[in-house]
Regions:
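A structural boundary/capping signal
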Residues: 1-173
């Protein structure tokens, strides 16, 4: 029992160093600074849950993307598309901002967000970005003071929306 405890402590000391090295490799893999956000989320997940299998993350996102893709029509306006995506995620699937326990670490670990359907602005925005990537929607993240939101990069006018507030569409003011 004591050996098992010592081994566990050694592993817990090694894992953060390995993850830091992997984050460094990820950052260097794209000199333009546009590195793979999904890989970064997986590394972050391993920091909080080192023994958890992360392959289910991509599978869960693929399934959600398949479901929402069937609901979006090609002739919809960008605003209608965003409304359909956010209605699917925040009303049909029940994702929401964790307003009660905002600082719960599980709000930052993506598998926990998918399981609990609760997150913080950046993880819920990442969810929209990941689904957008899978179904061909130009959704990117936007950092604001005190908040992280998502933007649909429309050719006519960008559409800003707040995943933490159930996808509420925002004005540019």
């Amino acid at each position: 029992l004591k050996i098992k405890s010592i081994a566990s402590e050694i592993i817990q000391a090694i894992i953060p160093r390995q993850l830091l090295r992997q984050f460094g490799q990820l950052a260097k893999s794209s000199p333009s600074g546009h590195w793979n956000l999904e890989k970064g989320v997986i590394l972050l997940q391993k920091f909080g849950y080192p023994d958890e299998e992360t392959s289910s993350l991509s599978q869960s996102l693929d399934l959600l993307a398949k479901e929402v893709s069937a609901l979006i029509e090609h002739n919809q306006s960008p605003e209608q598309t965003i409304q359909r995506l956010t209605r699917f995620l925040f009303f049909e699937k029940g994702f929401e901002g964790n307003q009660i326990d905002f600082f719960d670490p599980d709000n930052t670990y993506f598998l926990r967000v998918l399981d609990r359907r609760k997150g913080i602005p950046i993880t819920l925005s990442a969810l929209c970005i990941f689904l957008g990537q899978r179904i061909g929607l130009p959704i990117v993240g936007v950092g604001l003071p005190g908040r992280y939101i998502a933007k649909y990069e429309s050719l006519t006018q960008p559409i800003y929306f707040d995943p933490f507030d159930k996808g509420r569409i925002l004005s540019q003011e």
